[in-house]
Every structure is written in structure tokens, then in C-alpha cells.
């Protein structure tokens, strides 16, 4: 009877193979509550996952590739679990990521300009070989 009921269930190794994730990652996702509605245990103690968990793992992987953290993904999955489509919240998260990337790019441009300025001065005034108080006087403002 148990085998008939479990035919639509995947062991963790099978799920890892099909999803492209490691067993360790899947266990971690289960531990932090990302897979809770889709996990059962067999009578012998094996984790058994509903085949729909593959869609859930694909969503997690894609959301991470777009820059969302697991902490940001978890509430989106909770909305889905309550029967809601989380697309508006996903859109909001992606817009926040775009803003954060823009701010980071500005900071990197500023850092790049500072590095170029230091290297320009470096060429004009090579460091002396004499030791002094500064570890490298060329990078001191």
C-alpha cells in the first residue's frame, strides 16, 4: 500500500539530481522552511518530496539568480502557499534590486575614479624607496 501512495514522491537524491541542486542545499532549504509544505517522511525515515517541489526549487533558483536572498524569497513562497500569486511582490523586490544595483554602480564609479587618480599621481611621483611612517605613501590622502 505504501509503495502505491509514494509513487508521486521523490527521495532527496532523486530531487537533487532532477533539480541540479545538492542534497545539502535541499536539506538546508527544508531546515529554513522553504520546503515545509512539500516534505513527508516514509515509514523508514526517508524524506519524500512531492514532485511539485521541482517548480518550487526552480523558482528559488531563478529568484536567487536575479539577486533575491533566501530571506526575500521565503515570504513570496508563503504567499504562494496561501493560494496567492506573488507576482506583485516579486515585481516590487526586483524594482528594489534595480535601485540597489544603481546605487552600487555609482559607488563603484566613485571608487574607480579615486583609483585612477591615485595611479595617475603614482606615475607622476613614483614612491621613494625610503621607509617612513606610512606603509605606502602613494595611497594616503
Residue ranges and their predicted role:
Residues 1-6, 84-141:
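C-terminal regulatory/oligomerization modules of transcriptional regulators
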Residues 1-78:
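Basic helix-turn-helix/winged-helix DNA-binding cores
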Amino acid at each position: 500500500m505504501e509503495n502505491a501512495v509514494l509513487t508521486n514522491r521523490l527521495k532527496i537524491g532523486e530531487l537533487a539530481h532532477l533539480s541540479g541542486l545538492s542534497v545539502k542545499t535541499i536539506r538546508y532549504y527544508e531546515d529554513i522552511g522553504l520546503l515545509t509544505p512539500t516534505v513527508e517522511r516514509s515509514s523508514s525515515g526517508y524524506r519524500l518530496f512531492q514532485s511539485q517541489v521541482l517548480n518550487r526549487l526552480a523558482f528559488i533558483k531563478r529568484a536567487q539568480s536575479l539577486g533575491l536572498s533566501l530571506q526575500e524569497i521565503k515570504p513570496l513562497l508563503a504567499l504562494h502557499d496561501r493560494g496567492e500569486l506573488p507576482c506583485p511582490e516579486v515585481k516590487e523586490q526586483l524594482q528594489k534590486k534595480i535601485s540597489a544595483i544603481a546605487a552600487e554602480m555609482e559607488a563603484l564609479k566613485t571608487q574607480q575614479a579615486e583609483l585612477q587618480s591615485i595611479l595617475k599621481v603614482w606615475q607622476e611621483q613614483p614612491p621613494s624607496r625610503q621607509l617612513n611612517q606610512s606603509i605606502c605613501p602613494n595611497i594616503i590622502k
